C-alpha cells in the first residue's frame, strides 16, 4: 500500500500555504489522502495483492513485484505507460498475468509503449509492432503481419528446412516495441 501511496505524493504533499491547515486536518488534505488510499487499494485489488497490502514489497514473489511496479505507475494516472522488459525473468504463468493486466490497462484508455523480448506478451497486447534486429528496423505492422514476416522469422528463428514455423512467436526472442 505504501508503494502505491508514494507514487501519489504530488497530490498528498501539502504546499507551504496549506501546510498548517493539513496539520489540523483542514484544507482538503484528509480528502486527498482518502482518495489516494482508495486509488491504491483499487490497484492492489486489480493486481490481486489487496490481501497483502501491509506486506513489505520485497517479500512479494518476483512476478507480484513486477505487477506492483506497474500499479505504482498507474496510480499517477498516465496517458502513456512506458515499459522496458516488464516480462524479463517471469515464468509463463506470470507473463500471462502481466499480459492480462496490460490489456486491462489498455481497455481503460491508457496507451502502452512496450519494449519486450517475450513475443507472446507483445503479440497479445499490441496493435502495432516495430521489430528491431541489432538496432536495425526489420518490420513494422500489426501482430499478424509481424508473425508472418519472413525477415522476422529469419532473424529470430533462423531459416531451415527442418524448422517448424507454424507458431513462430512461441519461441522467438525478438525485441519489439508495441503501442
Segments the model singles out, each with a brief description of its role:
Residues 1-179:
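Glycine-rich phosphate-binding loops of nucleotide-dependent enzymes
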Amino acid at each position: 500500500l505504501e508503494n502505491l501511496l508514494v507514487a501519489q505524493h504530488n497530490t498528498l504533499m501539502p504546499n507551504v500555504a496549506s501546510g498548517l491547515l493539513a496539520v489540523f486536518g483542514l484544507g482538503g488534505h484528509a480528502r486527498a489522502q482518502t482518495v489516494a488510499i482508495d486509488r491504491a487499494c483499487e490497484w492492489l485489488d486489480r493486481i490481486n495483492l489487496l490481501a497483502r497490502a501491509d506486506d513489505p514489497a520485497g517479500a512479494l514473489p518476483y512476478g507480484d513485484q513486477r505487477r506492483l511496479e506497474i500499479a505504482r505507475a498507474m496510480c499517477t494516472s498516465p496517458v502513456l505507460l512506458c515499459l522496458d522488459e516488464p516480462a524479463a525473468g517471469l515464468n509463463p504463468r506470470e507473463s500471462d498475468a502481466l499480459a492480462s493486466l496490460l490489456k486491462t490497462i489498455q481497455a481503460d484508455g491508457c496507451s502502452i509503449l512496450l519494449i519486450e523480448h517475450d513475443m507472446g506478451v507483445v503479440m497479445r497486447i499490441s496493435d502495432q509492432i516495430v521489430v528491431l534486429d541489432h538496432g536495425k528496423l526489420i518490420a513494422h505492422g500489426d501482430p499478424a503481419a509481424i508473425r508472418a514476416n519472413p525477415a522476422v522469422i529469419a532473424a529470430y528463428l533462423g531459416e531451415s528446412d527442418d524448422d517448424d514455423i507454424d507458431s513462430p512467436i512461441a519461441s522467438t526472442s525478438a525485441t519489439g516495441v508495441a503501442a
